[in-house]
């Protein structure tokens, strides 16, 4: 089993797809990596030579931030926005959608389950 950036790649999948199991690498970056290292995208992970695995590992480490480094950078960016008090930071701080989505209805994923609010009481006759 090939191990790149701390992730075990599935042996039966094509390399082009298997690389997308690494956080920070999607289909496009996977294709770029394979083209730059000269590895055939249709090769199965189990058929990769040790030399190809080393080339892939070195290319990814040199050119992309992936896995833990990328996660850390994303968290730092969010924390920085919260500290400087920009609009996006305020939305993060209040656990509301950040990218301009409506919140009157919907946004349940971000806001969490509904909290029950006491309904209107009917006024009694005078």
UniProtKB/Swiss-Prot annotation:
PROSITE patterns, alphabetized: RIBOSOMAL_S13_1, RIBOSOMAL_S13_2
GO annotations of cellular component type: cytosol; small ribosomal subunit
UniProt region (Disordered), positions on chain: 96-126
One GO MF term attached to the UniProt entry: rRNA binding
tRNA-binding recorded as keyword: yes
InterPro entries in the cross-refs: Rbsml_uS13_C, Ribosomal_uS13, Ribosomal_uS13-like_H2TH, Ribosomal_uS13_bac-type, Ribosomal_uS13_CS
Keywords noted in UniProt: Ribonucleoprotein, Ribosomal protein, RNA-binding, rRNA-binding, tRNA-binding
GO annotation terms (biological process): translation
Keyword Ribosomal protein: yes
Function recorded in the entry: Located at the top of the head of the 30S subunit, it contacts several helices of the 16S rRNA. In the 70S ribosome it contacts the 23S rRNA (bridge B1a) and protein L5 of the 50S subunit (bridge B1b), connecting the 2 subunits; these bridges are implicated in subunit movement. Contacts the tRNAs in the A and P-sites.
The family this protein is said to belong to: Belongs to the universal ribosomal protein uS13 family.
Subunit and partners: Part of the 30S ribosomal subunit. Forms a loose heterodimer with protein S19. Forms two bridges to the 50S subunit in the 70S ribosome.
Protein name: Small ribosomal subunit protein uS13
Lineage per the UniProt record: Bacteria, Bacillati, Actinomycetota, Actinomycetes, Frankiales
Gene expressing this chain: rpsM
């Amino acid at each position: 089993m090939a191990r790149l950036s701390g992730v075990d790649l599935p042996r039966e999948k094509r390399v082009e797809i298997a690389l997308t199991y690494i956080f920070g690498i999607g289909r496009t970056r996977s294709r770029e990596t394979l083209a730059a290292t000269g590895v055939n995208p249709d090769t199965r992970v189990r058929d990769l030579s040790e030399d190809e695995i080393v080339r892939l590992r070195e290319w990814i480490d040199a050119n992309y931030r992936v896995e833990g480094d990328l996660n850390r950078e994303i968290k730092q960016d969010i924390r920085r926005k919260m500290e400087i008090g920009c609009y996006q930071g305020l939305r993060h701080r209040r656990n509301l959608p950040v990218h301009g989505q409506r919140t009157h209805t919907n946004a349940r994923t971000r806001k969490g389950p509904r909290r029950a609010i006491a309904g209107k009481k009917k006024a009694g006759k005078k």
